[in-house]
Amino acid sequence: MTKTGYINAAFRSSQNNEAYLFINDKYVLLDYAPGTSNDKVLYGPTPVRDGFKSLNQTVFGSYGVDCSFDTDNDEAFIFYEKFCALIDYAPHSNKDKIILGPKKIADMFPFFEGTVFENGIDAAYRSTRGKEVYLFKGDQYARIDYETNSMVNKEIKSIRNGFPCFRNTIFESGTDAAFASHKTNEVYFFKGDYYARVTVTPGATDDQIMDGVRKTLDYWPSLRGIIPLEN
């Protein structure tokens, strides 16, 4: 994590144009109004343990979420350091539940044992290709298929080579959080007080940053007064 108090995890909701953003041990539910500055906070900031009752007695309820990605229906994987869980986040209700875990990343995803991903993951986003997800740790990334529970191409690559659009930007060395937009093949990346909206092409390297790397609060007005968050 680059700076405490900023967005350190996020995932796209099953509800259109909504996303969960995690900051320290809290989160907000946001209508992020893709491509505009009409975003608004729908809920929060509130402690993870209060908004997700099923996480109350877990590491996530105590310390928060530092990486996450959506899967199918109302389900998402969440991470904190070397632990992870699959949850049903039950949008706009209090019926959330843990489906699997919490367990160590290496137990949930055995192919990460002995890799930089074993003890924590910085950020992730759901791809539009099948059940694939991109995960980031430091200046490296991997592509996994959560349905077959395997690493695509069995290789970990550098962000610099896989995402040439990030060369000579703050994202070349890593990212704090990411989530896939409801707009096809658009992804938001966050690092400290900056963000980038990127058009991605699954499996290719011709991604492009839209409008450059920008200050988050300049274009996400609903987060003013929320980040940086002081616990």
UniProtKB/Swiss-Prot annotation:
- Protein function: May play a role in response to oxidative stress and polyamine biosynthesis.
Which source organism? Pisum sativum
State the compartments where it is located: Cytoplasm, Cytosol
Major subcellular location class: cytoplasm
GO terms of molecular function: calcium ion binding; nutrient reservoir activity
Which sites bind Ca(2+)?
8, 66, 122, 176
Cite the Gene3D superfamilies for this sequence. Answer: Hemopexin-like domain
Q: What is this protein called?
A: Albumin-2
The Hemopexin repeat boundaries are 4-55, 62-112, 118-166, 172-223
How does the annotation summarize its subunit structure? Monomer and homodimer.
- Which positions make up the signal peptide? none
The record's annotation in Pfam families points to: Hemopexin (PF00045)
Domain of life the protein comes from: Eukaryota
SMART domains, alphabetically? HX (SM00120)
Q: What is the lineage of its organism?
A: Eukaryota, Viridiplantae, Streptophyta, Embryophyta, Tracheophyta
Q: Keywords in UniProt for this one?
A: Calcium, Cytoplasm, Metal-binding, Repeat, Seed storage protein, Storage protein
> Per the record, what is one GO cellular component?
cytosol
